[in-house]
Amino acid sequence: MPTAPATVRRHDIDALRGLAVLLMVMVHVAATAPPPSIGSTSALGYLVAGLGGLAAPLFVVLAGWGAAGKPRSWRSRCARAGLLLAAQVLVNLCAPHLYGPFTPGVLSLFALLALIPWTHPSQAVQRGVRATAAILPAVVLVAPALQGPSTWDGRVLVENPQDLLGHLLLTGLYPFVPWCGLAWLGVMVRTHGAAIRQAGIVWSLCGVVVCGLLLFRAAEQGVPWAAPTSPNGQAFLTFFPANAPFLLAASTGVLLLWTTGAWLARAPGLPALGRLSLTVYVAHTPLLWLLHRTVEAPSAILSAGLVIALTFVWWPIAAFWPESVRTWTFEAALSKV
């Protein structure tokens, strides 16, 4: 969502941002108004969750890609982080059925990432920062219990400063660890590009194979293959917290989507949507609260209609957004600091 500081915008990157926000809105609407007749472990449920589950990882990789541009001053990084934290509080207040006022979320993760000097005049500092971001996700392998419980309530409740700090760094919805690893991936894609193409192909092949094997094993054992949360620990892939299989699947999915950037850039209006992705993310949140209050146990047809309408309505809105009011967006505010 945070835009790259480059002077010339790349349409493929903007198109990927546009795709990411469409996927994010889609999965949020689908989760808010799910039809009782379609279970989360059905083929359709896995398809929607799988595509929607790539939204946040794609955004984080794009954030890393953007951060790998020109170095920013400490003052600029703090100002951007402050704006993103304010946007997070606004999102929380617009969706009280999901979050507390100070629940850390994806925008607070972007705020933390904005504070990190991914590019720095000192090569020693730059290498140290990037190496640390690459190593920290190993926590999910070495000590997965540190990530906290796989329950929604346990990851959104903030009762004191200790809860806030813990959720920001490790136990929340989108904690810095291990999500910083996906930001590091974005940095690597921008700084090394074609040089890591072969490594990316190998990683993606491994990811596809491992995910396929886990899917087969889940079907064999009669347990969920993937789930947002898994209080009983049965699901192989969990989003909250982001466990190792999920991180492998997410990075694989993002790398595969990345290869479609040039093709997506040709979609009319999609890059324009990407340039308003943060604004759209914030603006769609009140609709989730409205859906929660007004729609209960919808039919499959109604649910599908709501998902399609409330997802794709943002595409023409962004495409025809007047230039005269483009300054009244979160992206414009970020570009000024």
Language model regions located:
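Alpha-helical transmembrane segments and their immediate juxtamembrane cytosolic regions
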Residues: 1-337
